[in-house]
Amino acid sequence: LGDVYKRQVQPQMREVPRNMGIGSGVIITEDGYIITNNHVIDRSDKVMVTLNDKREFEAKVIGTDPDTDIALLKIDANGLQPIEYGNSDDVVLGEWVLAVGNPYNLTSTVTAGIISAKARQLGGKMNLESFLQTDAAVNPGNSGGALVNAKGELIGINTAIQSPTGSYSGYSFAVPVNVARKVVSDLKEYGKVQRAMIGIKMQELTPALAKEYKLKEQSGIYVAEVIPGGAAEKAGVKVGDVILQLNGYEAKTFAQLQEQLAQYTPGNTVQMTLSLSLIHI
């Protein structure tokens, strides 16, 4: 893990005026594109980036996405060392991770922990919620920093903590990198995020609902309504079907389904695994 620290602690982002706040960021290209959190730079008049070698740059805000709390910055620099991407879909519970950032202005701080949960929701603080949960210590100033695996690959952007005091109390949360990558790609190409929809109204299935609807599945996404003309209708999805997977990944909760859909653009084709209702027979 020590080698991971040396290779991956690259970007440190600061907001100006400095008494207004500080955060972290992740260099993703050699020519100066940086991911951070939207809440770090929101409402700022000027954003300054300080690299690990103490060079400072004024950053241009390329775009922001409050729904996922992701922002994309650009600095006028070349020859930077970008981080390598991992695959957040393949992260497993108990996997060791490192959180990198500037807690309390303590630059280049690295803490270790494990993945405690996936597809975690925090009660609707953001419109799209499907976080990686970890017990790596994250505090004010870590926002926008990297969550990396044991190979030093980026698997998430540290975003939130669950705490009554505002400081770390055992749980921290990161936006999955697969979601962040898609947001960044859209911000660069379109200036805003292109949201994919499948055209249904849905309920998250519980054993009680399964009993009420006389369904064999005890968990999944119950299709309560199919929107006329939408992608689901065109694919033959019916009311009463239960969504289980999207492109081979589990999608049995709202958070899991949101996380998978957030990786796609309108017009993309996805494979959906369903438990069919009797309407199909």
Tell me the role of every PLM-derived stretch.
Residues 240:
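Conserved catalytic motifs of ABC-family nucleotide-binding domains
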Residues 2-229, 233-235, 249, 254-269, ...:
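Serine-dependent protease modules
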